[in-house]
Amino acid sequence: MASPLRFDGRVVLVTGAGGGLGRAYALAFAERGALVVVNDLGGDFKGVGKGSSAADKVVEEIRRRGGKAVANYDSVEAGEKLVKTALDTFGRIDVVVNNAGILRDRSFSRISDEDWDIIQRVHLRGSFQVTRAAWDHMKKQNYGRIIMTASASGIYGNFGQANYSAAKLGLLGLANTLVIEGRKNNIHCNTIAPNAGSRMTETVMPEDLVEALKPEYVAPLVLWLCHESCEENGGLFEVGAGWIGKLRWERTLGAIVRKRNQPMTPEAVRDNWVKICDFSNASKPKSIQESTGGIIEVLHKIDSEGISQNHTGQVASADASGFAGVVGHKLPSFSSSYTELQCIMYALGVGASVKNPKDLKFVYEGSADFSCLPTFGVIVAQKSLMSGGLAEVPGLSINFAKVLHGEQYLELYKPLPRSGELKCEAVIADILDKGSGIVIVMDVYSYSGKELICYNQFSVFVVGSGGFGGKRTSEKLKAAVAVPSRPPDAVLRDTTSLNQAALYRLSGDSNPLHIDPSFASIAGFEKPILHGLCTFGFSARHVLQQFADNDVSRFKAIKVRFAKPVYPGQTLQTEMWKEGNRIHFQTKVQETGDIVISNAYVDLVPTSGVSAQTPSEGGALQSALVFGEIGRRLKDVGREVVKKVNAVFEWHITKNGNVAAKWTIDLKNGSGEVYQGPAKGSADTTITISDEDFMEVVLGKLNPQNAFFSGRLKARGNIMLSQKLQMILKDYAKL
């Protein structure tokens, strides 16, 4: 059984703790080692009167049981005084439970100004005042847990409680924003809607129901949400009588009710009402970004359905003939010089690491095969979008605050030099009318002398400039391609650093959106977002690693569509499908499941002979029989072995010096699994050994450690895990 949850040394402030729920919270926290501030004004359930006896009785009860507590008798509107009591007595504040409340129930028409105001002051303003007083202290100590107390009345409404309902749902809105602002400082805020008997509810509930809904049936949820090991943040929970349920927002898929070059009408709303209100296949947005985001994907959908922006009498920003003069316009040529240092800086910015030995060629100029990552070719060309660039094109007026990077194509004609100077020539290839904006398609060619090294195509969306009657598609635009519908052939993951955007911007993209919290907030994001081209670089590196063994000479081209933003610190998961020399892929944020790069692919230069990344079926290899036997043996004892080993081993079996087959022994997930092919996720240890030497190890003729030190067995990753190989091969590989 797991150890009990303790709060030793934590300082907990509970408001309205003189009775009911607050008393139950205070006693429960104190029983588990917390230092408790028991706040209660001492008035009745209507907020009339005051006194010290209620808080004093709870403090005395805690002390009798061996706990530590102090009383506070101030109104929650004096939040600073409550927090000062905690600081003066115990020196810190870790947990705030906003529980204090009163009732002034009246039918709506009978609510007086006083009835309305006092409810807002105690419930909403009081919680604000107390939490604000504690906030900076929690930020400085990089820790805090906050509970807001809402109500079923606030969530669903209740007759006679308009004032109470408004305040209670307001607390949920307050909590939702505190979640966003407190996340970086490890401050969690959750909201509960309790059903419990108290001096407030005893006037509206039958006596036997009040008795059944004991506060002690709510307190355990509050304690769990306030414990340092609880990762829940931003949740809304109904709780009572020993039952707990979590709530979330749900939104219909809705309907688009406007058509190309036609006004939007109330009749169109009426005619689509059933679809607008249909919760089949509903979405469940978890943030304002999810609610309003995904604009590029939406615009592509609008484009494919032939739907345009709604004109309301405003003149379009330009006409087709005006933009026609822009198409074909050549921007001034420019040079991009770079050294090995810039190549290394870029590689680090897109996640290359010395933790992966095969990445050394990208981060160490002294490596025998030092190479520049292929996607650095975008860095070479991006100056065409900055430093004047598009802003100086005659006839093209752009508000760069409304520019979104929609798609990117890069093609290499030979590997990028490890250093040098490339001359770049840019041209406006086309302009498309997407109704609610325009898409500018720009081609950039980069030369070393007269030799073409790489070609970029930038597709940027400018919000609010469309509707001029121009064409919606272009044969010049490199097409994005949907990924296959089958499960991916390979998946790689990398967790980005909190400093990822700060590091990547050193490669030349200095947009403050990616570093300045204030600028990001103005743009509608809770914090600075990662560069889309940084995610692009991570994804391309995953494909190169998985299917080309980091051989940059095999990289031919890449096309991506940017779908959603990524926040530094999130985990990027690249899902890949191999079809010939084309690797389809999409990239997700592992924590949310959001697709951030979609309809993407990498084209590889074909190779002759056996491919190191696409192993044969392993025919005529003795090792295939052994792996099959290990798989059969693990079916009965897999879970026990997983507990002992807790690792994923990827095997590269060679024949005549070439990789002839790959196998994975997954002893980390579920009941274990053995399958042919690379690890579905990331392997903890990758082992390369010949088919003959593998059989020698299995038969006990060759010790794995001796094989490693003699060079006959090569391991990368966590090589200490290879010590467990003897147990695996000895016990489960007997033929």
From Swiss-Prot:
Domain annotation SCP2: ranges: 623-735
Motif (Microbody targeting signal): 733-735
GO molecular function (one): 3alpha,7alpha,12alpha-trihydroxy-5beta-cholest-24-enoyl-CoA hydratase activity
EC number: 1.1.1.n12, 4.2.1.107, 4.2.1.119
Binding-site list for NAD(+): 16-40, 75-76, 99, 164-168, 196-199
Coiled coil: none
Domain MaoC-like: 483-599
Region Enoyl-CoA hydratase 2: start-end pairs: 321-621
Sites of Phosphoserine modification: 52, 304, 308
PTM sites of type N6-succinyllysine: 46, 57, 68, 84, 275, 355, 423, 578, 662, 724
Localization of this protein: Peroxisome
Subunit text: Homodimer.
Protein's recorded name: Peroxisomal multifunctional enzyme type 2
